[in-house]
Amino acid sequence: MKIKLAHLIMLLGLAMLPLSCRFSGFTTMGNPGPKLSKATVFAPDFLKALYKTELTLYGRTITGIIVIKKVANGYQMAMVSEVGLKYFEFFFPEGSPFNAQAKYVMAVLDREPLKEALINCFGLLFREANYNSQTRLKINESETKVLLIDREKGSRFSYYYHPISGEVGQLIQNRFFGTRTSIKLSNYKNDAPGSILVYRGKISMNLQRL
């Protein structure tokens, strides 16, 4: 029993190592003040963007165009093939993007675990970071990158972003009992990122703005 307990303690210690190292180079911010911008993926004046897309699902790859459009109460997203065949269409309500509505999903993709994974990946793009008493804010030594950490419904969210522009460079969702989602964003063009790379288990996406 003692051997098993010692082994368990060792495993827990190893599991905590990535957590302690992940934030190396960042120190806790004091009073951020009004100059600190909020983490932003799609700017408030964003209206519409098209992305050339390569989507790999459990070893199978589909390609096409993803259209993201800002509507009255959220965001509309659809993916179509190069010949106009629709793969899926989702509506992500503002304020609760993980409660997205599947407007259409092609039969071959219409599987609950897959739909849930797609909604989670895309929903993370539209989620607004929380700024409250539970939020942790850190900044790197050169003061060029802020790390915001908040928690919601069994998940921890990490936003790495520029303190002045608010442009998010990386988004991470760690679910306490689930799959980790990581999104890298770059090449911002005024109102939205030019490049979006998504990694979630056996699902990956490469979106390049047109």
Task: Give each language-model segment a name.
Residues 98-130:
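Acidic/charged, solvent-exposed loop-and-adjacent secondary-structure segments enriched in E/D, K/R, S/T
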Residues 30-52, 143:
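Post-signal peptide N-terminal segment of mature Sec-exported envelope proteins
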Residues 140-210:
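Gly/Pro-enriched, hydrophobic low-complexity segments
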Residues 22-24:
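Bacterial signal peptide processing site
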Residues 1-9:
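Bacterial N-terminal signal peptides that target proteins for export
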Residues 17-20:
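C-terminal motif of bacterial Sec signal peptides marking the signal peptidase cleavage site
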Residues 81-88, 104:
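Membrane-embedded segments
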Residues 42-76:
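Post-signal-peptide N-terminal segment of Sec-exported extracytoplasmic proteins
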